[in-house]
């Protein structure tokens, strides 16, 4: 999502999705992470499960916030472009290039907004799996 200089490039939706896919690796591998780091009853004395669960929870929250910020930043940038194109279309409605570009940007904006729904599902699934494995070891802070 972020280029080496720290700026987001939201112009190409395919790249946007590819970067989100990479950013969702922690969620995709949550079950594996829990299985390899949270001990079963027979190994509970060898590993501090509460510390492990806390660290995993913090990593999850950091990833969720990072993706949420990235998606919302791209939505804001694309919304701004759509607004500018609407103004151009209002001034010169016969310019087909502007009309086509506006449709393209509106479609991209709609797809980016749908990523927020995907993000909600991914986050809920990860937190559910986390809670099932770590509920006896770590209780996350409540959000007010």
Curated annotation (Swiss-Prot):
The keyword Cytoplasm does not apply. It comes from Salmo salar (Atlantic salmon). Keywords: Coiled coil. It comes from the Eukaryota. Belongs to the MIX23 family. Disulfide bonds: none annotated. GO terms for cellular component: mitochondrial intermembrane space. This is Protein MIX23. Pfam families: MIX23.
